[in-house]
Amino acid sequence: MVRVRFAPSPTGPLHIGGARSALFNWLFARRYGGKFIVRIEDTDLERSSRQSEENILAALRWLGLDWDEGVDAGGPCEPYRQTERLHLYRHYAEILLQSGAAYRCYCTEEELAAEREALMEKGETPRYLGRCRDLTPQERARLEAEGRKAAVRFRVPRDRVIQVKDLVRGDVSFECNGMGDFIIMKSDGIPTYNFAVVVDDHTMAISHVIRAEEHLPNTPRQILLYQALGWDTPEFAHVSLILGKDRSKMSKRHGATAVEQYREKGYLPEAVVNFLALLGWSPGGENEVLSIEELKQQFSLEKVSKSPAVFDLDKLNWLNGYYIRQSSLERVAELAVPFLEKAGYIRAPLSPEEFERVKMMVASVRKYLNCMEEVIDHVKIYFTDNFNNLDEDAREVMAGQQVPAVLAALKDKVASGGKLTGAAARAALKEVGKELGVKGQQIFMPVRVAVSGNTHGPDLDQIMAILGKDEVVKRLSRWV
C-alpha cells in the first residue's frame, strides 16, 4: 500500500515550499488509494513550539489536506511527535552500537571546530575524520572519567558509492569517502534528523518519501542507516526547488512566503492548491485551472519536472481572481465581511438587509478582485464622498460645458422619483440625456465622477442603486 507522510518541524508557519510538499504527498496518496500521514518533527527543542504546530495543522486544514493518520488523528503508529518517540531512537541506536555500525564519540565542540577549520584551510570539505572511531575500552573509560558526554556516530563505510534511484531525478551517486562519520544521537539523547527520519519512516511503513530537492544530500546517509538496520528503503522522489521570477531562491521580495499570509489576504484555498500543484508538476495540455478532484485524478510523479519551479505571483492572482468570479456571490460576500469590518466600513453582525447590501457591493466589484483584501479599495466609493482630490482625467470631465445642467437635471429626476433601483437609474439617465440632447460619455462620465469620484469602476447603474436615492441626490447636489 502507498503510505506517504508530511513531516514539518514546528519552528514557524507553513511556508509555500512545505505546503507544496504536503500537497504532492496528499495527491499521491489520494491518486493511488493510499494513506497520508502527518508527523511532527519537533526535536529542535529550542525553536519548536506547540503554537507553530497548531498553525501548521490549521494551514493544512485550510488547504483541504486531510490526513489519515498523525497528530490529532491517531493511528496504528502512534505517537506521531518525535519528542514522544525518543525511546525508539535510543533503542535502534543501541542496536547499531552493538553491531559495530555506530560508536560513541567524545569530541568536544571546540575540537570539532578546530578540525573543521584545519580542513577548510587545506581546501578540503569539512567532515569528521574519525578521532573516536576506533577507541579502545581503556580510552573510552578515560574520556568518560574526564566527564565528557558521548554522542553516537554512524560508522560510514570507506570506498563505497551509494546509488539513489530517485523517481524524479533519476539515478544519483554519492561517494562515501567525502561524507565523514555522522552523528545519529546527540550527547543530550536527542536524535539527529537523518536518524530519526529513518526510524520513523520504517516504523510507520512509509512507502514513498516525496520531499524537496534540498533533502537529496541527506539521502545517502539515510540509505546507509536503512542498510545497517537491515531494513528496506522506501522509494525517493525529490521535487525541484521553488525560485522567484528572477530565478533566485524564493524570498519575501517575491511575495508572501507563509500560507497563512495568503489566507489573511483573502486568497481562496482552492486557488492556492491549484497554484501549488503547478509548481513543478504539469498535467499536460493548456488547461491550468484544475479542481481538487481533477488534481487527484491526474497527479503523478512521472509529470514532476526536474527543473526549478518558478513562483509567479501574477499567475496566482489570476487563478485566485478566476475562483472568486466562479464562486457563489453568497460565499464571496461572506469572505468580504471581515475585510470591510477591518476597514471600518461595517460592523458585524450584519442584519439581513445589511448583508444584502454587501452582496450588491461585492457583485459590482468582484470582476476586479485578485484577492479579497482588494475589496476594501474597490468598495470605498460606497462609504466615502470625499472627492476633493480628483485625478486629471476626472477634472477634465467635470470641466465640460454641459456638466452642471446634466447633474442638476439628474438630481431633480432622482429626487422626484421612487426607490432608486438599477432599472430606475438607467431610466433616469436616459430621460435626462433625451431632454438635454446629450448621450453616451457626455452624460455617463460626469455622473460617474460626481457620485464615485472616479472615471472608471463598477457599472454606473449599480453604483447609484447601491448608494440609494438620498445619497445620490446628496452627491449630485455638491456639483450643482
Curated annotation (Swiss-Prot):
CDD domains: GluRS_core (cd00808). Zn(2+) binds at residues 105, 107, 132, 134. It comes from the Bacteria. Its cofactor is Zn(2+). The keyword Ligase applies. GO terms for molecular function: ATP binding; glutamate-tRNA ligase activity; tRNA binding; zinc ion binding. A motif ('HIGH' region) lies at residues 8-18. Transmembrane segments: none annotated. Binds 1 zinc ion per subunit. It catalyses: tRNA(Glu) + L-glutamate + ATP = L-glutamyl-tRNA(Glu) + AMP + diphosphate. Its EC number is 6.1.1.17. Its main location: cytoplasm. It is found in: Cytoplasm. A motif ('KMSKS' region) lies at residues 249-253. Catalyzes the attachment of glutamate to tRNA(Glu) in a two-step reaction: glutamate is first activated by ATP to form Glu-AMP and then transferred to the acceptor end of tRNA(Glu). NCBIfam families: gltX_bact. Monomer. This is Glutamate--tRNA ligase. The gene is gltX.
